[in-house]
Amino acid sequence: MNPFKMQQMLSQAKEMQEQMQEKLAATVVEASSGGGAVSVKMNGKKELLKLTIDPAAVLSLSGANPDVEMLEDLITAAINEAGRRAEEILKSSMQGLLGGLNLPPGLF
């Protein structure tokens, strides 16, 4: 392969990667658990942007038997669901970006 052509392809790949990172950073997914008691926003890079806990869920922690574990589970579930949604967006974007390259299935 022509070295100039190879350099040009590498430059294009780097530019595409930068564009993808910008797109992922700008993409926001939301997820909630416990009927909306806990909600999260995460970007496509799987960075947690916001965690919201309904005050009623916090009030349930007062009293003789606070259910801290339940609130922890709701937070974990919401974060994990947002992560799954962000992963779906990442896979979809990568497939669109690399669709014409005939790469082996399951690589991305």
UniProtKB/Swiss-Prot annotation:
Transmembrane segments: none annotated. It comes from the Bacteria. InterPro entries: YbaB-like_sf, YbaB/EbfC. Keywords: Cytoplasm, DNA-binding. GO terms for cellular component: bacterial nucleoid; cytosol. One of its GO terms (molecular function) is DNA binding. SUPFAM superfamilies: YbaB-like. It is found in: Cytoplasm, Nucleoid. Binds to DNA and alters its conformation. May be involved in regulation of gene expression, nucleoid organization and DNA protection. Belongs to the YbaB/EbfC family. Homodimer. This is Nucleoid-associated protein ACP_0492. It comes from Acidobacterium capsulatum (strain ATCC 51196 / DSM 11244 / BCRC 80197 / JCM 7670 / NBRC 15755 / NCIMB 13165 / 161). The lineage of its organism: Bacteria, Pseudomonadati, Acidobacteriota, Terriglobia, Terriglobales.
